[in-house]
């Protein structure tokens, strides 16, 4: 039985370099990934290196608010 809120939550990771380029209208889009994290093990914001198809390289993807 789970007490309180669920431990595993779904989070959205967004490319940080595409986010900066979208202000200047250089990027074709913003890369986003959906994943899960354990709230007890990682209470802070999640940051992972993932492949961005718009930048054509591996960049840091950070967790965004829903």
From Swiss-Prot:
SUPFAM superfamilies: Zn-binding ribosomal proteins
UniProt cross-references to Gene3D superfamilies, sorted A to Z: Ribosomal protein L33
Keywords, comma-separated and alphabetical: Chloroplast, Plastid, Ribonucleoprotein, Ribosomal protein
Compartments (UniProt record): Plastid, Chloroplast
Entry GO MF terms: structural constituent of ribosome
Family matches, as Pfam families: Ribosomal_L33
InterPro entries (alphabetical): Ribosomal_bL33, Ribosomal_bL33_CS, Ribosomal_bL33_sf, Ribosomal_zn-bd
One annotated Gene Ontology cellular component of this protein: ribonucleoprotein complex
Domain of life according to the entry: Eukaryota
One of the GO biological process terms: translation
Parts of the chain that traverse the membrane: none
Family classification: Belongs to the bacterial ribosomal protein bL33 family.
Xref: NCBIfam families: PRK00504.1 (NF001764), PRK00595.1 (NF001860), rpmG_bact (TIGR01023)
Protein name: Large ribosomal subunit protein bL33c
Protein species of origin: Cicer arietinum (Chickpea)
């Amino acid at each position: 039985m789970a007490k309180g809120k669920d431990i595993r939550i779904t989070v959205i990771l967004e490319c940080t370099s595409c986010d900066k380029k979208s202000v200047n209208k250089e990027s074709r889009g913003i890369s986003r990934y959906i994943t899960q994290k354990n709230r007890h093990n990682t209470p802070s914001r999640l940051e992972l290196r993932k492949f961005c198809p718009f930048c054509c390289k591996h960049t840091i993807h950070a967790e965004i608010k829903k």
